[in-house]
Amino acid sequence: MSNSKELAFRYDLFITPEWRDRFDLLINESMKLPLEGRILDVNCGTGALALEIAERMHGKGEVVGIDPSPERVAIAQAKALVKKANDVRYEQGIASDLPFDSHEFQVVIGDASLLRADEIEDLLAEMVRVAQPEGRVILKMTTRGTFGEFFSVYWEALYAAGMADDVWTSLERLINERHTLSEAEALAERCGLRDVESFTSREELNYETAEDFLEAPLITDCFLSEWLEIVPAESRDDVLAQLKSVIDRERNNAPFDVTVKAAVITGVK
């Protein structure tokens, strides 16, 4: 098992370009962020977006990045040091209990794309709390239908392993736990935002083989353990073997493609 420092480096090298950058690009293509004031980036990872925003501000504001992983924060701080970026700082902290006073930031950006659905409301409520009145809140997330191709073959693998009836209810929960776009917008309004709007993109992740998919850092570090929670521990190796077999059969010598429904939900406090 990877230690926390190795996981942080894997996050920076693999998960940021394969996953995070897609959501950050969606923000950059959909809206213009202010070039002055205070901006907070919650769950900032290894700091790329916060650093990019700070560089655009040319000394007219401050960007604060916060992340629960001290190892990722250390990588972000090292990047800022190399860039001699004095207008960005990074802190370790928990998104559901942000270490800031209310009404501190003109813009609050938060990454919920790797959170479970039941964790998003606490994150969003905290983002709204620390935003200034009339401040903008921007939430990155995935919506229902993400990884739909995987769940289809997962069902086949569970059936082949003789477990489909035992875990069907849990699998159905996994398939449906992500918010729909309308549910996400309604959540933003319940948390205190107005003028809520959303921007979406349909992304594809491509893997040459089942092994490439199941051993990709994005999958192993961020999703696979949750997917396998519904399977008894003693049966997981069998289910993984069935998954490899089903994926390689279904892809028919073509890449295994999975869809990510990326969304940015934004509103004004």
Segments predicted by a language model, with ranges:
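Conserved catalytic/acceptor-binding region of the Class I
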Residues: 121, 134-208
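Class I SAM-dependent methyltransferase Rossmann-like catalytic core
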Residues: 5-18
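A short acidic, Gly/Pro-enriched loop at the edge of an enzyme's catalytic core
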Residues: 96-108
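Conserved alpha-helix/loop element of class I SAM-dependent methyltransferases that forms part
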Residues: 18-37, 52
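Class I SAM-dependent methyltransferase SAM/SAH-binding core
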Residues: 38-42, 46-97, 122
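A short SAM/SAH-binding and catalytic strip from SAM-dependent methyltransferases
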Residues: 106-120, 141
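Short glycine-dipeptide loop
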Residues: 36, 59-60, 131-136
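C-terminal helical/coil "lid" or tail adjacent to the Rossmann-like core of SAM-dependent
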Residues: 195-253
